[in-house]
Structure formats: C-alpha cells, structure tokens
Amino acid sequence: MKISRIAQRLDEAAVSGKATPQLTGDDAVTVREAAEIQRLLIAHRIERGARQVGLKMGFTSRAKMAQMGVSDLIWGRLTSDMWVEEGGEIDLAHYVHPRVEPEICYLLGKRLEGNVTPLEALAAVEAVAPAMEIIDSRYRDFKFSLPDVIADNASSSGFVVGAWHKPETDVSNLGMVMSFDGRAVELGTSAAILGSPIRALVAAARLAAQQGEALEAGSLILAGAATAAVALRPGISVRCEVQNLGSLSFSTTGER
C-alpha cells in the first residue's frame, strides 16, 4: 500500500540521515493521506521503543502560512527519542538538513481536548519553559509541499527544554536571543507565535481532536518558532536566552 510504503521511506530517511525525494508523481498524496503517513511514521519509532510525549505546532507565523498558502497550523508528534538533554550534544551526522529555532514549551497537568478557550487552555497547564526545536526536513534541498511536510512529522526531529516555571508565568511577549558560540544569530519575541503562544496551545487541542486525539496530562506542547530557523553546523554551542525564563543550550558534533 502506498501510504505504508511512503511512511517506511520517510522513517528510513530519518534513521539514516539521508535525503529522500519529495512526494510527487505516483507518490503524491493528499493532506488527509499525509496525516496517516505521519501516524505510521511515528508508529515505526514506537515499535523501536520510543514513546509519544507530546506535540509540536508548525506554521505559527502569518508569514509562514502565507508562504505555504495555508490558513491554519500544522502539527507533528514528539517522541522520547527526540528529547535532547539540556546542555547535551547532538551528532549532526544523524540529520539531513538540521536547523534550530527558539520556542516556548507547555507541560500539561490536565487533559485538554477539542475547542477550548485560552483560559481553559491555561487552566490545563502545569508549567512553562524555554525550549529549542531541531527541525530537519528529510526531503532533498529542504523543499516540500504542504502534504510533504505533514507526512514528514512537520519536520520535527529533536527538542531541548529548559527549566520549568509556574503556569501563571506570562509568556505572551518575551524577548528571545539565540546564539552560536556566543554570537547572536536570531533575535525575536514569543509574541511572534500567533501573537501569544497560548493560541498555539488552543490550536493544538482543536487540531488533535480533528484526528480523534486529545492532549493528555503530562504532554509537552511546543508552541512554535519565535524566529526563523537557523542551519546548524558541527562543533558549535547553541544557546537560547528567554526573558524571565532563563537560558538553555546544547552543542553539536559530527560532520555535514
């Protein structure tokens, strides 16, 4: 079956760190089929012992939505094998086109499902933290269509989470600086995430429900990028400082 075959191909690309062609011609798929491919892709990881630990949101800036010709967000799944310890290191040989972006992460203390208000979403939050996501499209030349990126787990490949803070901490408009070896490479604000990151959490509950899923207690939700993603290179220290939330870091090894 085409859906299963594509999921296997994308899984092999992620495991090997080797690029794969876009889903064109006989492999072209619809958005609905792409969502099923993503589910099967993650199932391969779970079969190898990983656990699903949350979701990541994508297209959380109006500019990115316009670029992709869409009017809504997309989401991908976070698994335990994607979690990079704060202060740890990653081997870039395991990635295809690795890039990093600063984010806000929510930890849910209660189940969240369906159409909820921002206040209801906040009531389900147990803690908030600064975070970074490592994105890595498995497609050649980092080029993809909307179905392509959905099938490829919304390009999500890894994430780092900093120290947790009380849920009432205001994260709606916090300054963020991402640096490589002490040199700033991106400056931004959490307000770039849909005007406020809580809107991404609201959207996560809605979009998950559309596929028959809920955001369970204990889930991590990456709200989306606060700046453009920056390409990673070997042998650097990556640091993100977030106003009022502190900093987090990781380093890179390997060859590209």
Swiss-Prot record:
InterPro entries: Fumarylacetoacetase-like_C (IPR011234), Fumarylacetoacetase_C_sf (IPR036663), Hydratase-Decarb/MhpD_sf (IPR050772). GO terms for cellular component: cytoplasm. Its EC number is 4.1.1.77. SUPFAM superfamilies: FAH. Stable up to 35 degrees Celsius. Strongly inhibited by Fe(2+), Fe(3+), K(3)[Fe(CN)(6)], Ag(+) and Cu(2+). GO terms for biological process: catabolic process. Its cofactor is Mg(2+); Mn(2+). It holds the Pfam family FAA_hydrolase. Belongs to the hydratase/decarboxylase family. Forms a complex with AmnF. Involved in the modified meta-cleavage pathway for the 2-aminophenol catabolism. This is 4-oxalocrotonate decarboxylase. It comes from Pseudomonas sp. The lineage of its organism: Bacteria, Pseudomonadati, Pseudomonadota, Gammaproteobacteria, Pseudomonadales.
